Design a protein with these regions (language model features):
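Residues that scaffold, gate, or flank divalent-cation-dependent active/transport sites
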Residues: 2-100
């Protein structure tokens, strides 16, 4: 099952995506600038193999719902996201507001 829903954080538009898979759930909250995602995100791949794309992204681990993703600290962020003030430990919602 997959759901794609519009959501607003402090009045700013984002898209929340939930993909239920066997034994795991993929979670993403995005806008036109970047996204935060569950632990399935391979930040190292984005930094090393896709560095030329300057992808703004961060991952939070151990989250099982969109709300948990918003409330969790980011465990790792892409190099490109640092220019937006993102860093490990930044709360997901706060990171999204920095790109809104």
């Amino acid at each position: 099952l997959m759901t794609v829903e519009p959501m607003f954080i402090e009045g700013k538009p984002f898209t929340a995506v939930t993909v239920k898979l066997p034994k795991t759930t993929l979670l993403v909250i995005s806008n036109d600038v970047g996204y935060i995602m569950c632990g399935a995100l391979d930040v190292d791949l984005l930094n090393e193999k896709l560095a030329d794309r300057n992808i703004i992204s961060g991952r939070a681990v151990g989250v099982k719902t969109i709300q948990q993703l918003l409330d969790a600290p980011l465990e790792k962020v892409t190099n490109a996201s640092i220019a937006y003030g993102w860093r490990a430990g930044l709360i997901g919602k706060e990171a999204l507001m920095l790109i809104s």
